[in-house]
């Protein structure tokens, strides 16, 4: 990415941001960038904190690439995303959320098989074959696994057999849809 931008004639200053916003503030004061090319995956070891870094860029009035903090929050919170889908009448599998440190009680509207995953982590973190459960004992075990090992609430939803496809979309008023993969 850096070499391509430089070949196109742009001045580029890569910035490693682990857990210190001061790095960003100092770079902005010293270098005065026109835009921040945001490739941040996590902050302070947590993927869910990336929205806070983007909020910091907004507070500093630095234009940046990628989603705004609200988009990042919506993309991370699977239950909130499902509420937005419901509002727009987009179908999704029935689900329930088990907050951290709570016991699971499966409602009758959620028949097996089910899939259990983190409510907020991405990139399949915590998902394996064991995530697909077909009885209440395995369901309790998997929710405990998500709580104890991933450290988030658990999303339980009806399992749908098949491949999961990703579709990239870019734009606002005029959307560009990228190839499905």
For the regions a language model picked out, list residue spans one by one.
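Glycine-rich phosphate-binding loop of ATP-grasp-fold ATP-dependent ligases
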Residues: 94, 114-142, 164
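Phosphate-binding site of ATP-dependent enzymes
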Residues: 136-181
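ATP-grasp fold ATP-binding core
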Residues: 38, 85-86, 110-128, 151-161
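Short, hinge-like loop/turn segments at secondary-structure boundaries
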Residues: 30-33, 54-55, 81-86, 110-114, ...
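Short, glycine-/small-residue-rich phosphate/pyrophosphate-handling segment
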Residues: 76-96
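ATP-binding N-terminal substructure of ATP-dependent carboxylate-amine bond-forming enzymes
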Residues: 1-65, 69-70, 74-76, 87, ...
């Amino acid at each position: 990415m850096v070499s391509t931008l430089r070949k196109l004639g742009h001045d580029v200053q890569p910035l490693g941001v682990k857990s210190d916003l001061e790095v960003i503030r100092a770079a902005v004061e010293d270098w005065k960038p026109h835009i921040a090319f945001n490739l941040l995956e996590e902050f302070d070891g947590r993927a869910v904190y990336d929205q806070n870094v983007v909020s910091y860029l907004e507070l500093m009035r630095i234009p940046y690439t990628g989603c705004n903090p609200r988009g990042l929050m919506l993309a991370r919170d699977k239950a909130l995303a499902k509420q937005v889908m419901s509002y727009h009448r987009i179908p999704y599998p029935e689900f329930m959320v088990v907050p951290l440190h709570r016991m699971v009680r499966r409602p009758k509207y959620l028949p097996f098989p089910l899939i259990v995953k983190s409510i907020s982590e991405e990139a399949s973190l915590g998902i394996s074959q064991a995530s697909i459960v077909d009885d209440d004992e395995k369901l309790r075990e998997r929710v405990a696994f998500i709580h104890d090992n991933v450290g988030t609430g658990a999303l339980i939803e009806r399992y749908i057999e098949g491949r999961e496809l990703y579709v990239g979309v870019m734009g606002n008023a005029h959307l560009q849809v990228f190839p499905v993969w």
